[in-house]
Amino acid sequence: VEANSKLGLISGLVGALAIGPLLGIGHFSAAAALLIGVAFFGAATIAARQLPKEAIAPKPAEAAERLELRSAGIVLASAAMMSIRGVIGFLTFHLLFWIREDYGLAQFGLAAAASTLGSMAGNLVAPRLRRALREEVMLTIALSVIAGAGIAAAMTGGLLTAILVAFVANFSAAIGRLAFDSIVQRDAPDANQGRAFARYETRFQLAWVMAGLPPVFFTMPGQVGFVVVGVVAAF
């Protein structure tokens, strides 16, 4: 779990280093920024294909694995994590279109940077929190903080508030993810970890995508979006 936290920290650091130059390039040529992104993804694909081909789950899941992954604790934790990931997807696109319309695309770069810094900080703090708190408590705190931030932002509004919400939400999401990973490893010792986490991550990514669709189709006022964030995280 701590290894995953370190990987998240590294990916956040790389993203933070790349976002500044790309924003500068995008200011002069959006096509150039997109081409650079395509080049990076292409290089990553080539590197991934060079990894050793190993079967993570050569055999179907056994009864013990299925039973453990259906335990109440894991089911509730996965539902909580799905809510968190959905909120992050919604918030990302809500901020993109709202800030672009009301303030400008450059200001969205500040929110994107705050999101990256929040994820990095969460991955840095989460292992330390895990030594002091139970994983269920960490997940509850993560949801509560996101809900509180959303409601507070709905009451105040403004660009600075949006940037703070982006930081807090991604900070809490990183903590929640480490807590979820720990719960699965603790409560499903007989499960194939690679297979289990691949399935959960697929569900979480789908939640991120589906929750991001409404603000793509309907640009809503900033404070309305923050109400949605607060309500979804609260329930």
Q: How would you describe each model-predicted region?
A:
Residues 154-166:
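Helix-loop junctions at membrane interfaces in 12-TM secondary transporters
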Residues 64-115:
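Helix-loop boundary and gating motifs at the non-cytosolic
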Residues 37-62:
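Helix-loop junctions on the cytosolic side of multi-pass membrane transporters
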Residues 1-26, 49, 84-88, 115-127, ...:
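Substrate-agnostic recognition of the 12-TM MFS/MFS-like secondary transporter fold
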Residues 23-39, 106, 216-234:
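A membrane-interface helix-boundary motif in multi-pass transporters
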Residues 35-38, 137-152, 230:
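Structural signature of the two symmetry-related core transmembrane helices
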Residues 98-104, 132-133, 154, 183-188:
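Helix-to-coil boundary motifs at intracellular loop junctions of multi-pass secondary transporters
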